[in-house]
Amino acid sequence: MKRLAVLGSTGSIGTQTLDIVRKYRDRLEVSLLAASRVSEKLLDQIDEFKPEYVYIAEGEKIKGVKTLIGEDGLYKLAQLDIDLFINGISGINGILPTYLLLENNKKLATANKEAIICLGEIYGDKYSDIFPIDSEHSAIFQCLLSGRKEEVEKIILTASGGPFLNLPKEEFRYITPDQALNHPRWKMGKKVSIDSATLMNKGFEIIEAHYLFNIPYSKIDVVIHPESIVHGLVQFIDGSVISHLSPPDMRIPICYAISYPERWEIDVRRLNLAQVKNLTFLEPDYDRFPLLNIAKECGEKGGACPTVLTTADEIAVNLFLEGKITFDMIPVYIQQVLDQADFSKPETFEDIIFIIKETEKIFWNILKLQNVN
């Protein structure tokens, strides 16, 4: 019986993880559920899966279950004897639990890009033990099994292009949050859906791939693939290319992260290539989606830059979702913050937290000067 901790259990990754648990109750046991707060959904999960522990970021103890609360609770969470921690927390909130789990040498499967990116400068040497849940990085992981690292010529990440792949740039300012959240292929949370619409998500994945697989940026490419069938490719020095194909369903990489090195049957739509008919691959349009290049440049620069990028993006996305800035201004504000930020390379976790807080101050000062409330 494999014991799981599901961090972000009420979110998109968490609920799909629990779908896998439902199918394999004879193999999987939920030891801990973690969420930001008590909700009806969390209480329903507790009732169904009966974990020994529950973590909430804030609130009161939950009757009938060992409850861990706040930052002190996170430190206790990271010391629990659990076989696999699944981090489905969205955004910068996923950084501290990731740091603590790495510090305690816990087995971790994660979908939290921000933590991988921000902690990469100081914890990259521990990333070889992390199992990626992202469909693209799960695909690359599997493709890399076909050869040795020194035989890899390049890796290729695919991007759907999001809901605005063919929308003229001059219309970006009129995009609404509801339109941006309506991804044509994937069912995701709000933050990652907006990042997919701006292609920042793919920019993050470039940096993530660099850290997870210890691959230089010069060997990481991106192509637009609207069908979202091919999730990643690896080209080897003999000219061969190994690719990973599957229907666009996050339960596939989640289940693989749980079952590895085995593969377990799951109830997802099977791929029928005759019905797919066409697989399209396009060069990214860096003019319409500048965050892709901005992210890669931040990764290449290293130091504090990736942390500044993730912090600025999180604020910009939230402002857009709140209707305070337009869609086309997301990359503009992020670039303005990057231009003003000047921090030393982080050496400790405390340095990363300092960079995050100072970046937030820079962003809010920019907004204040431009009378954005």
Swiss-Prot record:
Reactions catalysed: 2-C-methyl-D-erythritol 4-phosphate + NADP(+) = 1-deoxy-D-xylulose 5-phosphate + NADPH + H(+)
Gene Ontology terms: biological process: isopentenyl diphosphate biosynthetic process, methylerythritol 4-phosphate pathway involved in terpenoid biosynthetic process
Keyword list, A-Z: Isoprene biosynthesis, Manganese, Metal-binding, NADP, Oxidoreductase
Cofactor: Mg(2+); Mn(2+)
Chain positions recorded as Mn(2+) binding sites: D134, E136, E205
Pathway: Isoprenoid biosynthesis; isopentenyl diphosphate biosynthesis via DXP pathway; isopentenyl diphosphate from 1-deoxy-D-xylulose 5-phosphate: step 1/6
UniProt binding sites for 1-deoxy-D-xylulose 5-phosphate: K113, S135, E136, S160, H183, S196, N201, K202, E205
E.C. code: 1.1.1.267
Residues annotated to bind NADPH: T10, G11, S12, I13, R37, N112, E114, G189
NCBIfam families from the UniProt entry: Dxr
Family of the protein in this entry: Belongs to the DXR family.
Main function: Catalyzes the NADPH-dependent rearrangement and reduction of 1-deoxy-D-xylulose-5-phosphate (DXP) to 2-C-methyl-D-erythritol 4-phosphate (MEP).
Protein known as: 1-deoxy-D-xylulose 5-phosphate reductoisomerase
Lineage: Bacteria, Pseudomonadati, Aquificota, Aquificia, Aquificales
Gene that encodes the chain: dxr
